[in-house]
Design a protein with these regions (language model features):
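Short, flexible/disordered intra-domain loops and linkers
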Residues: 24-26, 45-51, 83-95, 181-189, ...
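Distinct, well-ordered alpha-helical segments
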Residues: 125-135, 153-161, 183-199, 215-229, ...
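An N-terminally biased module of ancient metal coordination in phosphate/nucleic-acid-related enzymes
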Residues: 1-77, 83-94, 302, 312, ...
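Hydrophobic faces of well-ordered beta-strands that scaffold small-molecule active sites
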Residues: 8-12, 74-77, 114-118, 142-144, ...
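Well-ordered, non-membrane alpha-helical segments in soluble/globular domains
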Residues: 48-62, 93-104, 188-193, 219-225, ...
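H/E-rich (His + Asp/Glu) clusters that bind or coordinate divalent metals
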Residues: 211-326
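Active-site gating/metal-coordination segments in enzymes
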Residues: 79-187
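Active-site environment of divalent metal-dependent phosphoester hydrolases
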Residues: 13-18, 81-84, 122-126, 149, ...
Length: 326
């Protein structure tokens, strides 16, 4: 097991309010979203002062990341919009947009702490060009949320897109399961079986949230995870949000399936909370007390998973050079 400050968190959201220059967008509906309003309140971000709020979000993230005992860098994730059949941005149906240009700008400012996780909806008409542009700019993965971005990952028309990702060796990090943070239009798009096409085209796929369904006790996608892990050497899953009440059943399943640990990658789903609930009654009291006292979300995620016996890799283990499982 590797120790020290060496992990990369592959699932950290870059949040930003539109400031007139960053190209970001938030719909009126999203501004009224309960979770969105809660996050604004929790991080003390004022929507009336977007530039100040955006910098405060970054400053808070940097402070927590730099204070972590285990995590040295974070992949900042963008969020592409919805695109129509003509491949053009459909702003009317887009709830949240964090542009790749903004992601790349932040990466250039803080290269020691952050890596670029751009977002490219394969439905956009310039999707393949955007893959190459972002790869040239140093992106390390492409993140999508099909439920909210309104595309079917299994659509054969996206084969050239997946081949471009494979060519540029950019992992495809896709949300799996129900989506509650944003407004999911079609929750069936979160079925990991829809990622089979990308895998068949040679793309390295990372299933977010370890393929958990997101509906508390029912984990219907565990067999899919097991099949993909057996069939595809380029399939992985991150452990982001697995301490949440609606997803921690998958974390408990993973305790009983150590053969899957070699496919797990570290992630948190920052800025969402990390809970110690899954550890109650399952770890020594001393360990539980340490988790409760740990306020750093990156370190608590490491602690909960490791104390439960769930091992994982860091992103650089698969995109750079192989390293021992952590």
């Amino acid at each position: 097991m590797t120790t020290g400050k060496s992990l990369i968190d592959c699932h950290v959201h870059l949040a930003a309010l539109p400031d007139g220059n960053n190209g970001c967008y938030i719909s009126p509906t999203m501004l009224k979203n309960v979770l969105f309003r809660f996050l604004l309140w929790k991080h003390q971000l004022s929507p009336t002062n977007p530039r100040e709020a955006n910098q405060k979000y970054l400053d808070d993230l940097l402070t927590e990341l730099r204070a972590s005992r285990h995590v040295q860098r974070a992949v900042l994730l963008g969020m592409d919009g919805v695109y129509g059949s003509d491949g053009r941005l459909d702003r009317a149906h887009t709830e949240f947009l964090i542009t790749n240009d903004y992601v790349l700008e932040i990466i250039r400012k803080y290269p020691k702490e952050f890596l670029a996780g751009v977002s490219i909806n394969p439905q956009r008409r310039d999707a393949i060009d955007e893959v190459h542009r972002c790869a040239d700019a140093g992106a390390v993965l492409v993140k999508v949320l099909p439920n909210a971005q309104q595309f079917n990952p299994a659509d054969p028309q996206y084969k050239p897109f997946y081949r471009a990702l494979a060519e540029r060796q950019l992992p495809f990090l896709s949300h799996v399961g129900y989506e509650f943070s944003l407004i999911g239009r079609d929750q069936s798009m979160g079925d990991p079986n829809r990622l089979r096409l990308a895998l068949d085209e040679g793309t390295t796929v990372i299933a977010a949230h370890a393929c958990s369904y997101g509906l508390i006790l029912y984990e219907k996608f565990l067999p899919t995870f097991q099949e993909f892990a057996t069939r595809y050497p380029h399939f992985y899953a991150d452990i982001s949000a697995l301490t949440h009440p609606n997803r921690f059943m998958m974390l408990l399943h993973l305790r009983r399936h150590p053969e899957l640990h070699d496919r797990l990658l570290f992630g948190t789903d920052y800025p969402l909370s990390v809970f110690h609930l899954p550890a109650w009654g399952r770890v020594p009291f001393r360990s539980l007390r340490a988790m409760i006292r740990t306020k750093n979300r990156f370190d608590r995620q490491v602690s909960v998973c490791r104390e439960l016996g769930v091992k994982f890799h860091s992103l650089d283990d698969i995109v750079m050079q192989p390293k021992p499982i952590r």
